[in-house]
Amino acid sequence: MKRFGLALVGTLLVAALAIPALGIGSGDGRKVLDFKTLAGVTAPYTGANPIRGLTGGGLPWEIADANGSVRADGRVKVEVEGLVLARRAPVPTNLQGTNPIPRFGAIVSCLTTVGGAATTANLATSTAPASSAGDAELDTTVNLPSPCFAPIVFVTTPGGAWLAVSGL
């Protein structure tokens, strides 16, 4: 009876350690990144000085509010309010404070490894409608690499130029 009890305890201990480990990297719903702010592209990054290989939009942008998340299963949620062309030069006066782009997308950028070498993976989402006031909601998925180190989320044009990035 004592042996049975020890065997049962041992089996339960192994199961308790092994079952959570099976979920690591298996596409579970854990948050990889959770953000409450995005920063609009500014003059030094409009066209020149790409971040992780991604070029900023051609003019400065500003954003009123944002939040979003990336989960281990690849689900990407981004909500932006007031993502518009900056209200200052060099943006033409008639475009300041407006969004001329009808759809926004997102790119999740991870540092990862391929064949033992460090590399960057930029994963584009589908696009979603954006209002002229710069409001949009994306709820989509990407195939995250494993590992996915130092994730960054960019809000982009349909062509992939970024307008806002996770950060301040």
Role assignments for model-derived ranges:
Residues G23-A72, G167-L168:
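N-terminal segment immediately downstream of the Sec signal-peptide cleavage site
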Residues G82-V84, C110-T112, T127:
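A mature extracytoplasmic/lumenal domain signature
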Residues V78, F104-A106, L138-T140:
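Hydrophobic residues positioned within well-ordered beta-strands of beta-sheet architectures
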Residues V91-G115:
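Extended low-complexity, serine/threonine- and proline-enriched intrinsically disordered segments
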Residues M1-V9:
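Bacterial N-terminal signal peptides that target proteins for export
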Residues I51-P100:
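Short, surface-exposed binding/anchoring microloops in extracellular/periplasmic proteins
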